[in-house]
């Protein structure tokens, strides 16, 4: 039953992302969904409960299930649900997350240098010994950015980053498999180490902004014109 429930949940999330089920409209009944997926109504009910907990849908009067306006009123649970239920994280949404990181990564990098330049330098000094493979770089890059977020003194930054950990893991094949990506990443570490060693917080901010912009633009170039751009909230 567990696998069947996951199958139903995944299919419904895919349909919601594609706009098959419109916000404000009723979802198909349990009976109809059970027939569609070839499972029991109990299995459908369990999947719907998970979607409701994540914020995709709401059960209203007379047990009518209505699709929420999740892009306008959802929260990070929606991202977690998408991560769990997607083989490949939607490229358009991934680009939006990279745009978000472009906004806050330079700030936590600057704050981290201001608060603990020696601590940041100590982490960055380990970069030269990293194996030149995607898995090692992904792990180190994640730990570096999380550490800088913590050292920034802003308690929200680590919470936001940790909410994206599953997404980041899924994106690693796009961000670190090519040699040019790894070379750019190592260049970023060397420049950041120099900035941290000098205690130059503003330089670290600018270096990080340039690096995040490079990753964003390169990601968009890899996918070309992104398909299925998310609609702007009404």
Q: Which residue stretches match the model-derived regions?
A:
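A broad structural signal for alpha-helix termini and local helix breaks/kinks
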Residues: 37, 152-153, 223
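Short loop-to-helix capping motifs
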Residues: 29-30, 153-155, 199-200
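All-alpha effector-binding/dimerization core of bacterial HTH-type transcriptional repressors
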Residues: 71-147, 187-207
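Solvent-exposed, non-membrane alpha-helical residues enriched in polar/charged side chains
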Residues: 13, 17-18, 149, 193, ...
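C-terminal all-alpha effector/ligand-binding and dimerization domain
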Residues: 128-129, 162-234
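Short linear motifs at protein or domain termini
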Residues: 1-103, 226
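Short, hydrophobic secondary-structure boundary micro-motifs
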Residues: 23-25, 121, 158-161, 204-205
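Hydrophobic, amphipathic alpha-helical faces that serve as interaction scaffolds
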Residues: 84, 88, 100-116, 142-181, ...
